[in-house]
UniProtKB/Swiss-Prot annotation:
The UniProt record lists the keyword Cytoplasm: yes
Protein name: Cyclin-D1-binding protein 1
Subunit structure: Interacts with CCND1 and GRAP2. May also interact with COPS5, RPLP0, SIRT6, SYF2 and TCF3.
Family indicated by similarity: Belongs to the CCNDBP1 family.
Region spans: Interaction with RPLP0: 2-190, 240-332
Amino acid sequence: MASATAPAAAAPTLAPPLQQLRHLAEELRLLLPRVRVGEAQETTEEFNREMFWRRLNEAAVTVSREATTLTTVFSQLPLPSPQETQKFCEQVHAAIKAFIAVYYLLPKDQGITLRKLVRGATLDIVDGMAQLMEVLSITPTQSPENNDLISYNSVWVACQQMPQIPRDNKAAALLMLTKNVDFVKDAHEEMERAVEECDPYSGLLNDTDENNSDNHNDEDDVLGFPSNQDLYWSEDDQELIIPCLALVRASKACLKKIRILVAENGKKDQVAQLDDIVDISDEISPSVDDLALSIYPPMCHLTVRINSAKLVSVLKKALMSAFKMELECLLD
């Protein structure tokens, strides 16, 4: 006769510790797309800036602490039991989700530029923790290579940088403008160096002309290797490069001028205006890159002129936006 008492359900079997870490890494990576497109949490409460940043910093400290704890227990033998590993993984997952939840508390009206910076920091922390899980799941746990990866893991760097994030949209805008100035400065210096050396591909190709016969050079052309006209500027090319350099130099000066206008006249409550200035200024660096790349041989003069006109248009929009903000400040 069958027993009237049903057998107790068997406890679910936990995966091995390293497999649990790999699974957690996958779960964390699934959070990344949601953070990229996630909107700010709707609330009727007035935004408290000091409380938000305090909570965000505290959440970052918690994430860093959980990362350190997990690294300590998985960098030595014996490994934790499956039950202990489950607990560690749950704590890490909870710390990451708590950090993301705090990020969602930053409303849009505090500035799109500021939200982008905080979102970027959030993505760095989540991705850094996922990387850490993947590294810890590699065996043997005490290999020198593994320890090097762990010691330089980005999750701690991202958490430590949290207090350096700008606290308002004006500070965020100034940071982004400074980065754009640096990008354009680097592009200008690279262009100037190539022009001064009259060798746009200096260091990229070995000069072995003395070892190649005429027949060998003909063979290279057939095989698709660049000929001299593909590697060096013609006289017409060099004449066109001069105004291009001047335009990139003007772009750098323009960004510096905009940064000064924002620093001296921008107000923290001019959120939309600051966002507009940053959005337009963000177009300058890619436009400079397009122009810089188009001057390398073999040069298409039409492409260079199109990219130059595009950059001029972007510069005009950026300056108009900055001067508009300055005018509003003067009229207030």
